[in-house]
Amino acid sequence: RQRQMCIRDRLTRYRFDKVKERAKLKSSVARLVNILFPELEKLVSSLHIAVVYALLSNYPGASYIANANTEELAETLCTASKGRYTKSKTAEIQVAAGVSIGSKMPAKSMELKHTIALIRELDKEISEVESAIDKITSQMDSPIFTIPGIGRHMGAMILAEVGDFSNFASADKLLAYAGLSPSTYQSGQLQNCYAHMEKRGSRYLRYALFNAAKYVCLWCPTFSAYLEKKRSEGKHYNVAISHAAKKLVRLIFAMQRSGKAFLADY
């Protein structure tokens, strides 16, 4: 059926918007941490992991961490990290908090707590949407899911945005629809390249293709070699990825038309 009713009336777009919303909130967390406890970022692998969110939800700032009961702080970190954060790690963080140059700003601390709560809620919503997408795509037999690096969610977004491939007479027509036609890339300057891109084609499809291309270049030797070739020609990474995305579109178009699974020597 019409790409499973365009993945049930564009659940993929809804997911895209939710993920984008979450990304903005994560940027806000980074900004607030830079104000309240800037040293923390160097003490953890990422600000956006469960243990850090647990820490900042309970102790939203260096001053709160420095004055916290050490045993309670250690318990919070140990539980949230499933035992990976030991008492020595707790001590390291608390000592750093004690000498932090971070500001003590109650309003910012409250904003940090609320922002983390919003991210957690979005995580649940995105997970629910992804489960619905997975249920739909599990009933589809599109060959694009056989391409290394294309997961269910990104593949679903591509299929939903394209719809009926027979509406496109050629791969070039599909490239134009995605805003990836050769004329889009007249300038070698990355900024100009993006300025052209944003005005043309489906931004949802373009996003899906660019992100899919990045993963395909990681997992598929043929695409990886193609990306390296473009980079060796002096092209910026994002411009090289745009070339990989165009190659991916041609591959997807051919596969959908033939119904054949991915061949490594494409």
Predicted regions and their residues:
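A detector of single, family-specific signature residues
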Residues: 1-4, 8-266
